[in-house]
Amino acid sequence: MKRALISVSNKEGLLDFARGLEKLGYEIISTGGTYNTIKEAGIKVKKVADITGFPEILDGRVKTLHPKIHGGILARRIPEHLQQLQENDIGPIDIVAVNLYPFRETISRPGVSLEEAIENIDIGGPAMVRAAAKNYQDVAVVVKPEFYQALLEALEKPGGISPEFRLKLALEAFSHTAAYDAMISSYLSRVSNSDLNQNLILAGEKVYDLRYGENPHQKASFYRFMTPGLGLPDARQLNGKELSYNNIIDTQAAWELVREFDEPACVIIKHTNPCGTAVAATLEEAFDRAFAADPLSAFGGIIALNRPVDGATAQKAAEPFMEVIIAPAYTPEALESLQAKKNLRVLELPLEVAGGLQIRTVAGGFVVQESDRDKLDMDKVQVVTQKEPTVEQLKELAFARKVVKHIKSNAIVVARDGMTLGVGAGQMNRVGSARIALESAGEKARGAVMASDAFFPFKDTVELAAQYGITAIIQPGGSVRDQESIDECDKHGIAMVFTGIRHFKH
């Protein structure tokens, strides 16, 4: 008689699967809660303990770790193995259907203790899954309910399960256990404050396949990390088509920046750089000012807002062509306006998004760093010029600095009254970025402030800023020629402060 071992924490589809196996003549073996569920449904089932002759012990920690289980799973259907099974009174097991203790759900609960988490680390389950996957040519292993029906259909065919489907199931199984172990490793790293271990293991779960990547000829998919933490994959999409690869990257950039501000704020992003950023007394005004900062570049951009969106703001945001709008919430009036634009992707995501590591691949590996979440205390900046910035200028410098840290280096921001006037991004020399930002601001630069993501290697950036009427500058400092820039500021009556903190972004 063919035998199937079933032990699942996720009972979805379990009874239909068990009935299907029973109909096909399989003897079903099971454990604990799975056994009870199957038996109560009137389906014939045997306890693992009845097969092993050994009871579950240690509060259920040891159930299936027994030669009569693992021998039955690992035995090849070759004479030598079958003879050894017979000599040891072990029956072959042909199907293993196992999914693991809900570790992710456990560690996602607020206030969960380390002890609770440890008790939800599955041992016997992964051992059976790996054993069955290793012996995939003779044992079918299924770890997800969505494969139950396909497996039943394959079993009903004259030739049984194809080698290709067996291999696919084995791949799913090994991926399942690898992701499970990675999740445990990540959790223990977090609770022990050891984020950058000697071995860094990442586990992701596919959200969906993307139409294409950065360009149409590139394949792409969207994954979420399997460890708990709210992020972009958790955003509720309330309108529009699925996000594209570029939408996802740009939306993340917009969301990171808009979360910098305590007051109502709006950010408009193109190609991960902000073309307009503004704060104001109301969200509607913040949108108006952010859009006015660079309406030409805003076309086809990403809007991020850090307050629930009201009807008036939504009505204005729906007028120009935009790809995505993301905010913590929307009023019914706001949704009515936004959903009238069928192609506008409307996302809802709480501001309390988890931080994390930044990971970038290189040939043969990847580099990892902490996210740049520095919160500068403006009371601790160093005034290095004869002229001190006013209280109002310090406020403007703080705003400009929050923006500049989110721009591709070399980065320069010109701002005034809580609004960007010009942005210079990604130039190979700093004065080049300054020229772009200042030319974009034009006459509006007179009386404005400037922020730089890194020090000025020469005084030329200050010279250019003076020509446009910049009154105050914030930068990290640290150049061997800092004094030349300081002297140039003093020459033109510009106030300058050093933060001591660089914000390169590549």
UniProtKB/Swiss-Prot annotation:
<dbReference type="GO" id="GO:0006189">
    <property type="term" value="P:'de novo' IMP biosynthetic process"/>
</dbReference>
<dbReference type="GO" id="GO:0004643">
    <property type="term" value="F:phosphoribosylaminoimidazolecarboxamide formyltransferase activity"/>
</dbReference>
<keyword id="KW-0808">Transferase</keyword>
<dbReference type="InterPro" id="IPR036914">
    <property type="entry name" value="MGS-like_dom_sf"/>
</dbReference>
<feature type="domain" description="MGS-like">
    <location>
        <begin position="1"/>
        <end position="143"/>
    </location>
</feature>
<dbReference type="InterPro" id="IPR024051">
    <property type="entry name" value="AICAR_Tfase_dup_dom_sf"/>
</dbReference>
<dbReference type="InterPro" id="IPR011607">
    <property type="entry name" value="MGS-like_dom"/>
</dbReference>
<dbReference type="Pfam" id="PF02142">
    <property type="entry name" value="MGS"/>
</dbReference>
<comment type="pathway">
    <text>Purine metabolism; IMP biosynthesis via de novo pathway; 5-formamido-1-(5-phospho-D-ribosyl)imidazole-4-carboxamide from 5-amino-1-(5-phospho-D-ribosyl)imidazole-4-carboxamide (10-formyl THF route): step 1/1.</text>
</comment>
<dbReference type="GO" id="GO:0005829">
    <property type="term" value="C:cytosol"/>
</dbReference>
<dbReference type="InterPro" id="IPR002695">
    <property type="entry name" value="PurH-like"/>
</dbReference>
<keyword id="KW-0511">Multifunctional enzyme</keyword>
<comment type="pathway">
    <text>Purine metabolism; IMP biosynthesis via de novo pathway; IMP from 5-formamido-1-(5-phospho-D-ribosyl)imidazole-4-carboxamide: step 1/1.</text>
</comment>
<comment type="similarity">
    <text>Belongs to the PurH family.</text>
</comment>
<keyword id="KW-0378">Hydrolase</keyword>
<keyword id="KW-0658">Purine biosynthesis</keyword>
<dbReference type="Pfam" id="PF01808">
    <property type="entry name" value="AICARFT_IMPCHas"/>
</dbReference>
<dbReference type="InterPro" id="IPR016193">
    <property type="entry name" value="Cytidine_deaminase-like"/>
</dbReference>
<protein>
    <recommendedName>
        <fullName>Bifunctional purine biosynthesis protein PurH</fullName>
        <ecNumber>2.1.2.3</ecNumber>
        <ecNumber>3.5.4.10</ecNumber>
    </recommendedName>
</protein>
<dbReference type="GO" id="GO:0003937">
    <property type="term" value="F:IMP cyclohydrolase activity"/>
</dbReference>
